[in-house]
Protein backbone atom coordinates (compact mmCIF):
# COMPACT_ATOMS: atom_id res chain seq x y z
CA UNK A 1 0.00 0.00 0.00
CA UNK A 2 1.56 3.34 -1.00
CA UNK A 3 2.18 5.83 1.79
CA UNK A 4 0.96 8.81 -0.18
CA UNK A 5 -2.68 9.67 -0.85
CA UNK A 6 -2.55 9.56 -4.65
CA UNK A 7 -6.18 10.63 -5.04
CA UNK A 8 -5.64 13.81 -3.02
CA UNK A 9 -2.33 14.66 -4.69
CA UNK A 10 -3.60 14.20 -8.26
CA UNK A 11 -6.88 15.99 -7.52
CA UNK A 12 -4.88 19.15 -6.79
CA UNK A 13 -3.95 19.44 -10.48
CA UNK A 14 -7.62 19.35 -11.48
CA UNK A 15 -8.44 22.09 -8.98
CA UNK A 16 -5.82 24.31 -10.63
CA UNK A 17 -8.00 24.32 -13.73
CA UNK A 18 -5.27 24.15 -16.39
CA UNK A 19 -6.71 22.06 -19.28
CA UNK A 20 -3.54 20.11 -20.08
CA UNK A 21 -2.83 19.28 -16.44
CA UNK A 22 -6.47 18.41 -15.82
CA UNK A 23 -6.60 15.96 -18.74
CA UNK A 24 -3.36 14.27 -17.71
CA UNK A 25 -4.38 14.07 -14.06
CA UNK A 26 -7.75 12.53 -14.91
CA UNK A 27 -6.04 9.91 -17.09
CA UNK A 28 -3.65 9.01 -14.28
CA UNK A 29 -6.43 8.86 -11.69
CA UNK A 30 -8.41 6.49 -13.87
CA UNK A 31 -5.30 4.43 -14.65
CA UNK A 32 -4.29 4.03 -11.00
CA UNK A 33 -7.85 3.47 -9.80
CA UNK A 34 -8.40 0.67 -12.31
CA UNK A 35 -5.73 -1.47 -10.66
CA UNK A 36 -8.21 -2.06 -7.83
CA UNK A 37 -10.24 -4.42 -10.04
CA UNK A 38 -7.50 -6.99 -9.42
CA UNK A 39 -6.66 -5.88 -5.90
CA UNK A 40 -3.40 -4.18 -6.93
CA UNK A 41 -1.77 -1.05 -5.51
CA UNK A 42 0.69 1.29 -7.18
CA UNK A 43 3.92 2.59 -5.64
CA UNK A 44 4.92 6.02 -4.39
CA UNK A 45 7.48 6.07 -7.20
CA UNK A 46 4.68 5.76 -9.75
CA UNK A 47 2.85 8.69 -8.14
CA UNK A 48 5.97 10.87 -8.23
CA UNK A 49 6.50 9.94 -11.89
CA UNK A 50 2.86 10.73 -12.72
CA UNK A 51 3.16 14.16 -11.10
CA UNK A 52 6.25 14.97 -13.17
CA UNK A 53 4.36 14.01 -16.33
CA UNK A 54 1.34 16.09 -15.35
CA UNK A 55 3.58 19.08 -14.66
CA UNK A 56 5.14 18.76 -18.11
CA UNK A 57 8.62 17.88 -16.87
CA UNK A 58 8.66 14.55 -18.72
CA UNK A 59 6.67 12.98 -21.57
CA UNK A 60 4.45 9.95 -21.10
CA UNK A 61 7.03 7.83 -22.94
CA UNK A 62 9.72 9.02 -20.54
CA UNK A 63 7.41 8.20 -17.64
CA UNK A 64 7.05 4.63 -18.92
CA UNK A 65 10.81 4.25 -19.33
CA UNK A 66 11.36 5.46 -15.77
CA UNK A 67 8.99 2.84 -14.40
CA UNK A 68 10.67 0.06 -16.38
CA UNK A 69 14.14 1.19 -15.30
CA UNK A 70 13.03 1.41 -11.68
CA UNK A 71 12.03 -2.26 -11.62
CA UNK A 72 14.96 -3.46 -13.73
CA UNK A 73 17.26 -2.18 -10.99
CA UNK A 74 15.34 -4.10 -8.32
CA UNK A 75 16.50 -7.65 -9.06
CA UNK A 76 15.11 -9.24 -5.90
CA UNK A 77 11.43 -8.57 -5.26
CA UNK A 78 8.76 -9.96 -2.99
CA UNK A 79 5.41 -11.17 -4.34
CA UNK A 80 3.82 -7.90 -3.20
CA UNK A 81 6.46 -5.91 -5.07
CA UNK A 82 5.81 -7.98 -8.21
CA UNK A 83 2.13 -7.07 -7.97
CA UNK A 84 3.07 -3.41 -7.49
CA UNK A 85 5.30 -3.66 -10.57
CA UNK A 86 2.34 -4.86 -12.62
CA UNK A 87 0.15 -2.06 -11.27
CA UNK A 88 2.79 0.60 -11.99
CA UNK A 89 3.58 -0.56 -15.51
CA UNK A 90 -0.05 -1.02 -16.52
CA UNK A 91 -1.08 2.32 -14.96
CA UNK A 92 1.50 4.17 -17.06
CA UNK A 93 0.29 2.38 -20.18
CA UNK A 94 -3.35 3.18 -19.46
CA UNK A 95 -2.46 6.84 -18.97
CA UNK A 96 -0.72 6.82 -22.36
CA UNK A 97 -3.64 5.11 -24.12
CA UNK A 98 -6.21 7.47 -22.61
CA UNK A 99 -4.13 10.41 -23.79
CA UNK A 100 -4.25 9.24 -27.40
CA UNK A 101 -7.10 10.37 -29.64
CA UNK A 102 -6.83 7.53 -32.17
CA UNK A 103 -9.45 4.80 -31.94
CA UNK A 104 -11.12 2.22 -34.17
CA UNK A 105 -14.24 0.36 -33.13
CA UNK A 106 -13.33 -3.28 -33.77
CA UNK A 107 -12.34 -6.49 -31.98
CA UNK A 108 -8.81 -5.93 -33.32
CA UNK A 109 -8.65 -2.63 -31.42
CA UNK A 110 -9.64 -4.36 -28.19
CA UNK A 111 -6.98 -7.02 -28.69
CA UNK A 112 -4.44 -4.30 -29.46
CA UNK A 113 -5.34 -2.44 -26.26
CA UNK A 114 -4.85 -5.61 -24.23
CA UNK A 115 -1.47 -6.24 -25.89
CA UNK A 116 -0.31 -2.67 -25.26
CA UNK A 117 -1.41 -2.82 -21.62
CA UNK A 118 0.08 -6.17 -20.70
CA UNK A 119 3.00 -6.86 -23.06
CA UNK A 120 5.86 -8.15 -20.91
CA UNK A 121 3.47 -8.49 -17.96
CA UNK A 122 1.46 -11.47 -19.23
CA UNK A 123 2.93 -13.96 -21.72
CA UNK A 124 -0.41 -14.05 -23.54
CA UNK A 125 -0.91 -10.28 -23.96
CA UNK A 126 -3.24 -9.50 -26.85
CA UNK A 127 -3.96 -13.18 -27.50
CA UNK A 128 -7.32 -14.93 -27.35
CA UNK A 129 -7.31 -17.59 -24.63
CA UNK A 130 -7.08 -21.22 -25.70
CA UNK A 131 -8.94 -22.78 -22.78
CA UNK A 132 -12.09 -22.27 -20.73
CA UNK A 133 -11.99 -20.36 -17.46
CA UNK A 134 -13.90 -19.90 -14.22
CA UNK A 135 -13.33 -17.28 -11.52
CA UNK A 136 -14.62 -17.36 -7.97
CA UNK A 137 -16.43 -14.11 -7.19
CA UNK A 138 -16.98 -12.61 -3.76
CA UNK A 139 -20.22 -11.01 -4.91
CA UNK A 140 -21.51 -14.49 -5.90
CA UNK A 141 -20.44 -16.28 -2.70
CA UNK A 142 -17.62 -17.98 -4.57
CA UNK A 143 -19.59 -18.94 -7.65
CA UNK A 144 -18.49 -17.97 -11.17
CA UNK A 145 -19.93 -16.25 -14.21
CA UNK A 146 -20.29 -18.52 -17.23
CA UNK A 147 -17.83 -17.10 -19.75
CA UNK A 148 -17.75 -17.74 -23.49
CA UNK A 149 -16.36 -21.07 -24.66
CA UNK A 150 -12.85 -20.52 -26.00
CA UNK A 151 -13.74 -22.23 -29.29
CA UNK A 152 -16.34 -19.57 -30.10
CA UNK A 153 -14.63 -16.41 -28.83
CA UNK A 154 -13.75 -14.98 -32.24
CA UNK A 155 -17.23 -15.57 -33.65
CA UNK A 156 -18.87 -14.12 -30.54
CA UNK A 157 -16.65 -11.04 -30.67
CA UNK A 158 -17.47 -10.51 -34.34
CA UNK A 159 -21.20 -10.87 -33.65
CA UNK A 160 -21.30 -8.45 -30.71
CA UNK A 161 -19.21 -5.81 -32.46
CA UNK A 162 -21.16 -6.13 -35.70
CA UNK A 163 -24.46 -5.80 -33.82
CA UNK A 164 -23.24 -2.71 -31.97
CA UNK A 165 -21.86 -1.15 -35.16
CA UNK A 166 -25.25 -1.47 -36.83
CA UNK A 167 -27.13 -0.10 -33.83
CA UNK A 168 -28.48 3.43 -34.23
CA UNK A 169 -28.43 5.79 -31.27
CA UNK A 170 -30.58 8.27 -33.17
CA UNK A 171 -33.78 9.08 -31.32
CA UNK A 172 -32.58 7.73 -27.98
CA UNK A 173 -32.60 9.88 -24.90
CA UNK A 174 -29.22 10.36 -23.25
CA UNK A 175 -30.28 8.01 -20.44
CA UNK A 176 -31.30 5.33 -22.94
CA UNK A 177 -27.99 5.69 -24.76
CA UNK A 178 -26.04 5.27 -21.53
CA UNK A 179 -28.05 2.16 -20.63
CA UNK A 180 -27.32 0.69 -24.04
CA UNK A 181 -23.59 1.36 -23.66
CA UNK A 182 -23.65 -0.33 -20.26
CA UNK A 183 -25.31 -3.39 -21.80
CA UNK A 184 -22.75 -3.52 -24.61
CA UNK A 185 -19.89 -3.33 -22.09
CA UNK A 186 -21.51 -6.16 -20.14
CA UNK A 187 -21.88 -8.32 -23.24
CA UNK A 188 -18.29 -8.04 -24.45
CA UNK A 189 -16.91 -8.46 -20.92
CA UNK A 190 -18.83 -11.74 -20.57
CA UNK A 191 -16.87 -13.10 -23.54
CA UNK A 192 -13.68 -12.73 -21.47
CA UNK A 193 -11.45 -13.26 -24.51
CA UNK A 194 -8.21 -13.02 -22.52
CA UNK A 195 -6.77 -15.22 -19.81
CA UNK A 196 -6.20 -12.20 -17.54
CA UNK A 197 -6.69 -8.44 -17.63
CA UNK A 198 -10.17 -8.52 -19.19
CA UNK A 199 -11.76 -5.89 -16.94
CA UNK A 200 -8.99 -3.33 -17.30
CA UNK A 201 -8.88 -3.81 -21.08
CA UNK A 202 -12.68 -3.51 -21.23
CA UNK A 203 -12.61 -0.28 -19.23
CA UNK A 204 -9.98 1.35 -21.45
CA UNK A 205 -11.77 0.24 -24.63
CA UNK A 206 -15.14 1.54 -23.40
CA UNK A 207 -13.72 4.89 -22.25
CA UNK A 208 -12.18 5.48 -25.67
CA UNK A 209 -15.35 4.28 -27.43
CA UNK A 210 -17.65 6.50 -25.36
CA UNK A 211 -15.48 9.51 -26.06
CA UNK A 212 -16.29 9.07 -29.77
CA UNK A 213 -19.88 9.97 -28.83
CA UNK A 214 -18.73 13.22 -27.26
CA UNK A 215 -19.03 12.04 -23.67
CA UNK A 216 -16.79 13.58 -21.06
CA UNK A 217 -15.81 10.73 -18.76
CA UNK A 218 -15.93 11.45 -15.03
CA UNK A 219 -12.68 9.99 -13.71
CA UNK A 220 -14.11 9.73 -10.17
CA UNK A 221 -16.07 6.61 -11.12
CA UNK A 222 -13.05 4.48 -11.99
CA UNK A 223 -10.79 6.25 -9.52
CA UNK A 224 -12.98 5.35 -6.53
CA UNK A 225 -15.23 2.53 -7.70
CA UNK A 226 -13.24 0.18 -9.93
CA UNK A 227 -14.07 -2.90 -7.87
CA UNK A 228 -17.74 -1.90 -8.00
CA UNK A 229 -17.40 -1.78 -11.80
CA UNK A 230 -16.14 -5.35 -11.88
CA UNK A 231 -18.82 -6.61 -9.48
CA UNK A 232 -21.51 -4.85 -11.51
CA UNK A 233 -20.27 -6.64 -14.64
CA UNK A 234 -20.44 -9.92 -12.73
CA UNK A 235 -24.03 -9.32 -11.60
CA UNK A 236 -25.03 -8.37 -15.15
CA UNK A 237 -23.98 -11.83 -16.31
CA UNK A 238 -25.05 -14.20 -13.55
CA UNK A 239 -28.23 -16.21 -13.08
CA UNK A 240 -29.11 -18.78 -10.45
CA UNK A 241 -32.80 -19.52 -10.62
CA UNK A 242 -32.70 -21.98 -7.72
CA UNK A 243 -31.48 -19.17 -5.47
CA UNK A 244 -33.75 -16.57 -7.03
CA UNK A 245 -30.84 -14.60 -8.50
CA UNK A 246 -31.30 -12.98 -11.90
CA UNK A 247 -28.86 -11.12 -14.09
CA UNK A 248 -29.33 -7.36 -13.89
CA UNK A 249 -27.62 -4.36 -15.45
CA UNK A 250 -29.09 -1.90 -12.93
CA UNK A 251 -25.85 -1.69 -10.94
CA UNK A 252 -23.79 -1.20 -14.08
CA UNK A 253 -26.23 1.45 -15.33
CA UNK A 254 -25.77 3.43 -12.11
CA UNK A 255 -22.00 3.25 -12.54
CA UNK A 256 -22.20 4.41 -16.16
CA UNK A 257 -24.59 7.18 -15.21
CA UNK A 258 -22.10 8.48 -12.64
CA UNK A 259 -19.32 8.03 -15.19
CA UNK A 260 -20.98 9.87 -18.07
CA UNK A 261 -23.85 11.99 -16.72
CA UNK A 262 -22.30 13.22 -13.47
CA UNK A 263 -25.06 11.69 -11.37
CA UNK A 264 -24.31 10.68 -7.81
CA UNK A 265 -25.74 7.23 -7.27
CA UNK A 266 -24.43 5.55 -4.14
CA UNK A 267 -22.18 2.74 -5.38
CA UNK A 268 -21.85 0.15 -2.63
CA UNK A 269 -20.47 -3.32 -3.32
CA UNK A 270 -22.50 -4.92 -0.54
CA UNK A 271 -25.73 -3.96 -2.32
CA UNK A 272 -24.71 -6.24 -5.19
CA UNK A 273 -23.93 -9.30 -3.08
CA UNK A 274 -26.40 -12.06 -3.89
CA UNK A 275 -27.18 -12.47 -0.18
CA UNK A 276 -27.92 -8.78 0.35
CA UNK A 277 -31.44 -8.44 1.75
CA UNK A 278 -32.72 -5.39 -0.10
CA UNK A 279 -36.22 -5.70 1.30
CA UNK A 280 -34.90 -5.88 4.87
CA UNK A 281 -32.76 -2.82 4.28
CA UNK A 282 -35.71 -0.88 2.92
CA UNK A 283 -37.84 -1.94 5.89
CA UNK A 284 -35.17 -0.76 8.31
CA UNK A 285 -34.91 2.57 6.51
CA UNK A 286 -38.69 2.95 6.66
CA UNK A 287 -38.69 2.25 10.40
CA UNK A 288 -35.92 4.79 10.96
CA UNK A 289 -37.68 7.47 8.93
CA UNK A 290 -40.97 6.80 10.72
CA UNK A 291 -39.26 7.12 14.09
CA UNK A 292 -37.55 10.31 12.94
CA UNK A 293 -40.78 11.99 11.80
CA UNK A 294 -42.58 10.96 14.98
CA UNK A 295 -39.81 12.54 17.03
CA UNK A 296 -40.39 15.84 15.22
CA UNK A 297 -44.00 15.88 16.37
CA UNK A 298 -43.02 16.16 20.05
Residue ranges and their predicted role:
Residues 1-298:
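FIC/Doc superfamily catalytic core
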